[in-house]
Amino acid sequence: MNQKSNESGAITGGWGCAAPVPPAQAMTVSALRAALAAAPVLPLTVLWPDGDAIEAHFHVTEVGRVQKDFVDCGGTLRRTVTCLLQTWVGDDVDHRITAGKLLKAFEHAGPVLGGEDLPVELEYEACNVVQFFVTAVVTKSDRLVVQLGGKHTDCLAKELCVPSSRLAGEGTGCC
């Protein structure tokens, strides 16, 4: 991952500070599986939101269904469910994962995913564990390119916290 420093010395680039992607714009399991099935022999390249690629020798160590049940700051019970691809970068620098191999992992995960057409996220560990939405897959002549989009946090009960005219201001007291 290429990390750069901005004028204040903060580290940017790679996975940091990506523009957020609404969950509705994340690829679904069926769309990702279709893209993988269309080019099973091609190796995968995964691009950070800023266009840099993760290490080519990454592994997908888990394909899972993650359900998060929570109460937002306004007291509303909420649930999100996603398909999570956990990645790991090992020492085997000659390793390459193909679209067909990832498709096989999805087949093994079928009972866990339960037939739900969930939004797909990818999890990666750098200095911290970070998650991104998978937003697109593009077929090139020599590889399948998986594009990642950023996730973000937000107040889910803004209308209960403060008047909308004050949401952007300091000291609004939201949450």
What are these regions (language model features)?
Residues 3, 7-21, 152-175:
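Cysteine-cluster motifs in flexible loop/terminal segments that predominantly coordinate metals
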Residues 104-159:
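Helix-rich interaction surfaces within compact, conserved domain-sized segments
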